[in-house]
């Protein structure tokens, strides 16, 4: 049995402390760690995967081409919750096991969602008079690990908290002191602020559309720290043109970022890169959890 080779392939690197933690786990198990950071072009990834037995990734794309090149590969671990960047069918065809690390980044994402909320209600920090979150109705769209952390923080802000989750029993939501609603439509028509936490799936892609967001009350604020694919961008642009009271804040730059930025100055903001999970703590948690999946 050859020594197991573990490749950490991160175009957007982990914090150094996280890499040190991963290295410690991998080397303690007697495996070899290979680090490929900020590789920029796919050719470098294709070269690096050739002799890897396991790969730890972040938002890196693992498609059929990568899997074809990775002849010795057994395991792919996504450090994070969403694994829409991995071609699962191709992985199955190559007998490669795909794992994720749910829950490790949740608090980091939830805190950022509140940073975006405060920024929006305080008029992008431009010094003019804004509004407060206290007493406002917050809708949490999908009550998973991140959604639960958002609810916890919202209690401290004194918000009235609602949630909709098609897969989470009402009792689970309500025992947290959160009001469970029966549909996405009800959530959007009830809440002043909606925080999106749905994964990108065939069912959810483009589901956040004109008809749904238009149900929001006057001054509605949509915060997206989930995935850009869930937003129907053309319809959201049309709606925000018609309704100048709506705001959209996200940490995933839309494909139509330039259009949003040009048309909706003062009520739209996007971070340059997906950054909800970009904290040293979340990096360490997710990176070490990923390493533990392998060893």
Could you say what each language-model-derived stretch is?
Residues 156-174:
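NAD(P)-binding Rossmann-fold cofactor-contacting core
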Residues 120-156:
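Glycine-rich NAD(P)-binding loop of Rossmann-like domains
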Residues 50, 64-67, 168-262:
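Rossmann-like adenosine-cofactor binding region
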